[in-house]
Amino acid sequence: VIMQERTNSNRKNHEKPGPPEIRSIAVGIDCSPHSLASLKTAADLASRMHAELLGIFVEDINLLRLTELPFCQEIRQYSPAPEKIESTELERMLRSQARQAEASLQREAEIFRVRHSFSVRRGNVPKEVVAAALQADLLVLGRSGRSPTCRKGLGSTARNALSGSLKSILLMHEGYAAENEAVLVLCDGSDASKAALAIAIRMLRPGNTLHILLLPQYEGHEHLLESELSGQLPPGILRVEYHVLPHVSDSRILARYIRMADSGLLVLSDRMNLPAETVHNLINDIDYPILLVRS
């Protein structure tokens, strides 16, 4: 990794591609730790971007169908024997979770003073979340949900959003604090990567470092690319570091180089010159908060 640090002064007056407008932010809420972290980040973003916050809770139809199976039982912590799952009890639990989700949304909306709405849907959770977010400009999700099988990778809702949605997606995890974290952005000179850089600039907090990860397309391209991208940066960003990454299509190798640069929010697009499959595999491989920009 080749690293260079620049102070942001005497920028050239190149034409700056504007970031996609974000007027509404949808967030899926299931009360898991990753989901609640996503909600806090979404509310913060809505406040900073003067956007409306749309909370989504989905009653899982697959859980409800379990009650129709005669052999389906549950084992409770203090119960001596398995018990049949009753549909009325499950309905009550889902309503309780929905109330918790709405209360969490209202609490964050009040803290950040943003307009908000809340909707409850029933169906396949990944599909319903994506469908409910069709009118939003940004969908915010936890990297993983409640299922123990997805703790080390992406949850089913996040995977479905990657493959089935055309929206920009922000994937969060518990413990991320934007005010203390750097922002990293993958840039290869394509219009999609320039849009990602424009969004990354908006995500950066004052005083934090912006890491521009260059993916040159030919020998010597990194110098032209750095010069071109430097003209896109506003004068207020004082800490900028450029990193030249090797031309690789293996997401695991790419993730290794990104980790060498820094940790923080990783901003990228699956419409760059890098194959979309590589981008999606990278998102699964690297345990960073991810903002996937689709403009």
Predicted regions and their residues:
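Short, flexible loop segments at the rims of nucleotide/cofactor-binding pockets, characterized by
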Residues: 116-119, 147-150, 189, 242-246
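Active-site beta->alpha loop and helix N-cap motifs at the rims of alpha/beta catalytic domains
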Residues: 90-96, 121
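Small/aliphatic-rich secondary-structure junction motif
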Residues: 4-84, 179-244, 263, 285, ...
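Charged docking surfaces used in two-component/phosphorelay signaling
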Residues: 120-127, 245-251
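Gly/Ser-rich helix-loop-strand patches that form or flank binding pockets
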Residues: 2-12, 21, 35-41, 47, ...
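Short glycine/proline- and acidic residue-enriched helix-loop micro-motifs
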Residues: 82-92
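Aromatic/hydrophobic pocket-lining residues that form π-stacking "cages" and hydrophobic walls in ligand
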Residues: 42, 105, 129, 200, ...
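A structural motif corresponding to the C-terminal end of an alpha-helix
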Residues: 100-117, 236
